[in-house]
Amino acid sequence: MKIILASKSPRRIELLKLLKIDFEVIPSNIDENISEKDPKLLAEKLSYLKAMSIKKDGVVLAADTVVTLDKEIFGKPRDYKDAFRMLKSLSGKWHTVITGVTIKFKDEVITFSEKTNVKFKNLSKELIEFYINTAKPFDKAGGYGIQELGSVLVEKIEGDYFNVVGLPISKVWDILWDRGMIDASKGEINK
């Protein structure tokens, strides 16, 4: 049985490929504008809604990542100005990246979240402008991708690196493995 990844995120696709398991991509199409002020609950709710929107049989994996600084939640920047504002706000500070994950099995739904703390260097206006113009980070929570050029913005990280990229693959693996979903001899999902 294949896993269905309810995401078109190239980063999540690449991370799931690291697990060497068979999967197909069926992007969810939900309205992500929900009213939730708690970033952990927001990420978990969005991942849950994404997973539940997929009606095909199989193990559905969905995720949503948010960045939070103090009480502000950063999703994907709307435009250049918004990306600049986000990166300027994160400059020289610790922030938290939260990824909510939902795995929908036939008879069970598991939702959890992972938190990783990231500290940015002090970013000059020129570096922020260069980054936005070069990396085009408009599809990334917080306006940056740590696995790409965004790595030059980061001073320290505490926690799961892959969570910041968009999927805490170790925890996903553990859940699939613990439920006997991985056939170690074939490297595929069991039925």
Curated annotation (Swiss-Prot):
UniProt source species: Thermosipho africanus (strain TCF52B)
Relate the protein's function as given in its record: Nucleoside triphosphate pyrophosphatase that hydrolyzes dTTP and UTP. May have a dual role in cell division arrest and in preventing the incorporation of modified nucleotides into cellular nucleic acids.
Where is this chain primarily localised? cytoplasm
Q: What InterPro entries is this protein classified in? A: ITPase-like_fam, Maf-like
Q: Which reaction does it catalyse?
A: dTTP + H2O = dTMP + diphosphate + H(+); UTP + H2O = UMP + diphosphate + H(+)
Family under the similarity heading: Belongs to the Maf family. YhdE subfamily.
Classify the source by domain of life: Bacteria
Q: Any idea what this protein is called? A: dTTP/UTP pyrophosphatase
Catalytic site: 64
Named from the GO MF annotations, one term is: UTP diphosphatase activity
Q: Which CDD domains match?
A: Maf
What keywords sit in the KW lines? Answer: Cytoplasm, Hydrolase, Nucleotide metabolism
Q: EC number(s)?
A: 3.6.1.9
GO terms classed as biological process:
nucleotide metabolic process
Pfam families attached to this UniProt entry: Maf
Q: Which cofactor does it need?
A: a divalent metal cation
Q: Which PANTHER family match?
A: BIFUNCTIONAL DTTP/UTP PYROPHOSPHATASE/METHYLTRANSFERASE PROTEIN-RELATED (PTHR43213), BIFUNCTIONAL DTTP_UTP PYROPHOSPHATASE_METHYLTRANSFERASE PROTEIN-RELATED (PTHR43213:SF5)
